[in-house]
């Protein structure tokens, strides 16, 4: 909203400077974006009158003018096409200084002396008109300083309003705010009802009362739109960033800026029959005032006559029914359109107008009659004419209703952190036009006026009090609460610690979208029905993820495309399994790895990361809560993973995750030219462990046996280790696989596994007979169950 400071001060004028006013508005939530001077800096320019003109003897386009400043007559040479006797214009006399440090001196133009300069609006930086002189009103006082006459010691102030403050999209609304801020009186213009001098009306039918609960119309005959808009109105419009068009349009724009009620004037001769406010017919055509033809949709409210649509309600009028210089009779419209019926319609047709901007944010539903009378009075004063009666159609049941709000002083103190006196609370709210009635000590009933459709709750009133009292006056008080530290279960690992663990192992945390491309969903979860969004951001973000891998792999692609060859990322987040009925949202921890095992350095090679490197990272995560022994890795199958490099992770028989290399076909489809490894774990299982139990350290020596075993190639090392554990007895303290060999000297269908076993008794020394007997039992069981034998 852009407005003239002088216009505002005509309504309410607190005794403060412009800078202070601007700062106070911003602190009250009406953020000032810019302050622009109404004209450039100049001096010595007065209202002049052209007494006579003669053709320049040596220049076809120049005229020699005699110009009066009210006391003397001066000869001035001028080339403006609109210079003529009797014209009153800005006259820069000798010694004047115009914007840009341009000083007026006596000069000769083509041999003829010129004593001054006749000015255009552009030369004074008081408008854009540079195609001729700035024409002043016929009654302009000759000799008066032009800055005083036009009120150019003014500024245009632009405020950036939040969408809920549609009530401030007018000088009246801003004046109400300023009056409340400074406890200053607001002087509204006296708007009298205009008496009808003829009885012509056009019938009005509102066929969509929910969208248009109130519609007013009036016929005004015999207007003369050739009459110019008064300069004072043109200037107020200009300083509000509105271009002057003709008297009828200027007046409707002026009233909209002044009161906040959009209006529209139709050429009465172009209305067939009466007015119908209805929904458009699908595909109905309308050529708008800007010349654009639109194909209307059935959800668009239109103003129509008995044959065709005339305007998009609350947005823009039609070209064929618009007023022109030849219009003699007009039909003036003032209506209240429901916010929902207008919201988004302008944008859907590629439009944005001052009217739609206001209707989308809400217009005072009681304002239509006052705006109608104001516009009628201005039209009759400026263009002449004869007003008819106002026809009004109202659907009371569809008009907004605002319930009273209860305000408690205790709640004000609680939310703002200070005590505001009861009288001050009443004064501040009353200044905004609210009706405040005391119900009890420290409690009020507040009736909200029709222009404040954003107030419906007690907190809304408290916000208004904070704005008016001054945010900068509110005390700084930190929240006070009794915070008792929660006891964390020792057997529970928390996510921040898991994050730190992975970061310590060289990973970086990634955060990706929960919604992914349905095509990627199919690649990683083939055969699974995705949960699709009803209104996605874009087509490639239309499915909720069933795994964290798609987002991580996409982030991996992004890094690889930017020459980042070593990538190690992890993410924690939800996966979404199933449809809305029975949807399961499960916290997961996932990672993606590719590139070298270690960062590049002189002391370490560039060996590529492999399955077992990533498995070690996963084991570190699984062991974080102290329950690594409860997890097992078994060969598994996953449609997104390499069939020979996939591990299924189990805990007590429950599947809790997967680890493996991306399937070669999937890698090819995704353009990945190197091995990529991923893992994904159910976070709840990872974070749940067991408390460690202390066992007294044995003082007796350990006994170690190393066994080289031959097993079939398809026998997993974990199966061998499980059999060993089952038969090694209770004193086994350590078991590890330290070598795997396949090749020369070994049956091509077999492999060699070297394991180390360590026993230690807590209270005595173990002898060789005991260890040998246990070793024999292990070998016997391995041969019987896995066909694994001792290598000789």
Curated annotation (Swiss-Prot):
Keywords: Aminoacyl-tRNA synthetase, ATP-binding, Cytoplasm, Ligase, Magnesium, Metal-binding, Nucleotide-binding, Protein biosynthesis, RNA-binding, tRNA-binding. PROSITE patterns: B5, FDX_ACB, TRBD. Residues 400-476 form the B5 domain. One of its GO terms (biological process) is phenylalanyl-tRNA aminoacylation. The keyword Zinc does not apply. Signal peptide: none annotated. It catalyses: tRNA(Phe) + L-phenylalanine + ATP = L-phenylalanyl-tRNA(Phe) + AMP + diphosphate + H(+). Residues 698-791 form the FDX-ACB domain. It holds the Pfam family tRNA_bind. Residues 39-147 form the tRNA-binding domain. Tetramer of two alpha and two beta subunits. HAMAP family: Phe_tRNA_synth_beta1 (MF_00283). PANTHER family: PHENYLALANINE--TRNA LIGASE BETA SUBUNIT, PHENYLALANYL-TRNA SYNTHETASE BETA CHAIN AND LEUCINE-RICH REPEAT-CONTAINING PROTEIN 47. This is Phenylalanine--tRNA ligase beta subunit. The gene is pheT.
